[in-house]
């Protein structure tokens, strides 16, 4: 039987995805593919909470430091490169583990976005948003009306089928070629927000301000500069706000981003979450992964 099992660890910023990903990779002979839109950039280490060299030495990591910060990295780029990496890792007899919080990237990978490149991307995302508002019954009815012979429908396959009717060739497979296990991490909101605030303070101690200043001075208009943890300091550098106000902006925007991440994973991807502070964590996840891989 073809080996096509892929683990996917998602959740809000600062919840502990990196640590779990490394634990899973060690326990199940895996390699990690970053699903973070900012960690692809060389030199942006602190503000992106990039995995450290010590962490990368424990298990192989991919899609880290693969772009200069003057280059763009799109959802299309991610899906193409992640699919190739998944194949290479599976061919080695190892387990690919996607770890990240960029919902659009991960959803597009799982649902098999390879619909003719970026030119169709906006239209496809609009259709996907419309389909995501339908109930399962409404979705399945649309699919069966087009092809009554389709069996074993689930929500993901139904959305993929309807996308292909609009944008892709009709003989493509429904969804990705891989079998994904989604692992969602979460924590009590107050605890999570406290962790976010503490992490920003730690980033400041590690030199985030200098990293942001370098980006501001060299390439303030690039895609990488739009990430949380950098753009908030630009008004400080131009003399419009105080440093304290800039730091508070980073914390506020990070908390808001965490909320948006949770909304995306819950509503658009139907992720079930594990509380990282539950008594037996992460043993239930290990049990679920063992069952999935076997």
From Swiss-Prot:
InterPro entries: Dimethylallyltransferase, IPT, P-loop_NTPase
Disulfide bonds, paired cysteine numbers: none
Keywords: ATP-binding, Magnesium, Nucleotide-binding, Transferase, tRNA processing
Catalysed reactions, as listed in the record: adenosine(37) in tRNA + dimethylallyl diphosphate = N(6)-dimethylallyladenosine(37) in tRNA + diphosphate
E.C. number: 2.5.1.75
UniProt-annotated binding residues for ATP: 11-18
Pfam family, one: IPPT
List of residues binding substrate: 13-18
A Gene Ontology molecular function term of the record: tRNA dimethylallyltransferase activity
Site (Interaction with substrate tRNA): 102
Single GO BP term: tRNA modification
Keyword DNA damage assigned: no
Subunit structure, interactors included: Monomer.
Family: Belongs to the IPP transferase family.
Function: Catalyzes the transfer of a dimethylallyl group onto the adenine at position 37 in tRNAs that read codons beginning with uridine, leading to the formation of N6-(dimethylallyl)adenosine (i(6)A).
UniProt-listed NCBIfam families: miaA (TIGR00174)
Protein name: tRNA dimethylallyltransferase
Natural source organism: Lactococcus lactis subsp. lactis (strain IL1403) (Streptococcus lactis)
Taxonomy of the source species: Bacteria, Bacillati, Bacillota, Bacilli, Lactobacillales
Gene (UniProt): miaA
